[in-house]
Amino acid sequence: MNGDEKLGIWLYRTSLVVLVLFFVGFSVVVPIDAMAQASRSTNDALNTFIVVGAFVAFGVLSIIIAVGRVLVQRSCLQDIPKGYLPITPEDMPHQPSRSMILEQMDRSHKLAVLLKKPKEPVTHDGLARPDSDDHGLPPLLNYEDSIKIITSRLKYQGVFSNLVKLDSDTGDTFATIARSMSAQNKLSSSEAAEYIKLYEAIRFSGKEITKEQFLQFMDRSIFFLDSLISTGSIEPRSHRAGDGQKNYSFPPTRAQNTLTTPLQQYVTDYADNESVDTTNIIFPRSPDYALESSSALHYLTTTNTSSTVARKVTPSSYRKDFSGLNETASEEAFRGNNHLKLNDNESYDSVVKRC
């Protein structure tokens, strides 16, 4: 800023101060003079009119000046574009302010280039990534919904596939069911407690489920299922006296495969229906879980598992994978896929280290 600009600014400010002082002085003198003139007059009506009129004129003039200033300022601001930045000396005479604005603009440009595409994969809690995942999770898998489905099947349908008989009330919680199953099958109470603690932390913490928590819960769920299988909780059940039902075992024997069960009949009738979820109907179920209505049968055979991490098996994929296997090969494949070869009372941590 040169000398002429500084002189002009000082003249502008000085003249503004002088005019304001004159305006305030005359505004104060006018009412006082009006009252002094009225006091010398003998006409009371005229005196009252002069005094009241002076105060009213002063108030109206002050309001007009204030409102006019506001309207003029707003009209000037409306003419400025919304995306305009005051970076010129005419708009912002203060040099440090202009320099700060220009520096921040340069910094924003550099950050935009750096942050346009993140270098590391972005993973949000509660949802799987939309692209391929190194852990084999489906794209955009909702962790909370998957855990709800898994725990509901464990509670209402046995261990994922009606493998264990549950004598529980509808109002029992998942923790109660898990403790009851671990006690009935003589599993480690500490393992069951850790499994329940992890479930409650995931479901009731109020925070989004992380990928690590979801994978840990799936590992412990599989370990819990395999522990129940290893303890013999799904060994052949003898029929109860007088119930008129046949013995079943898991996996089914050749004699049981020759029997016609309601589930087998359902699969036969709808063998060409690709929408039928056969995850729960590959093997005949125990008579303890005999279905008493067609609606229950339809629910078990059409329950959607596409939102879980379990593979959805359709009739065509089942025939493609297992049609060429004989009974012995099928049983060996089942044992190889469903058992971790647990030792008696082996803990979850020891299995992880061994694998």
Curated annotation (Swiss-Prot):
Q: InterPro entries, per this entry?
A: DLT1
- The residue ranges for the Cytoplasmic side of the membrane come to 1-15, 69-355
* Transmembrane portions of the chain: 16-36, 48-68
Q: Where is this region: Disordered?
A: 236-255
Q: Where is the signal peptide?
A: none
Q: Name one GO cellular component term.
A: membrane
**Protein name according to UniProt:** Defect at low temperature protein 1
Q: What does this protein do?
A: Required for growth under high-pressure and low-temperature conditions.
Q: Which UniProt keywords apply?
A: Membrane, Transmembrane, Transmembrane helix
Q: From which organism does this entry originate?
A: Lachancea thermotolerans (strain ATCC 56472 / CBS 6340 / NRRL Y-8284) (Yeast)
Topology relative to the lipid bilayer, per the entry, is: Multi-pass membrane protein
Which spans does this entry mark as compositional bias, Polar residues?
Answer: 246-255
UniProt-annotated location(s): Membrane
The record's annotation in PANTHER family points to: DEFECT AT LOW TEMPERATURE PROTEIN 1 (PTHR40021:SF1)
Which superkingdom, per the lineage? Eukaryota
Record topology, Extracellular segments: 37-47
- Entry's family note: Belongs to the DLT1 family.
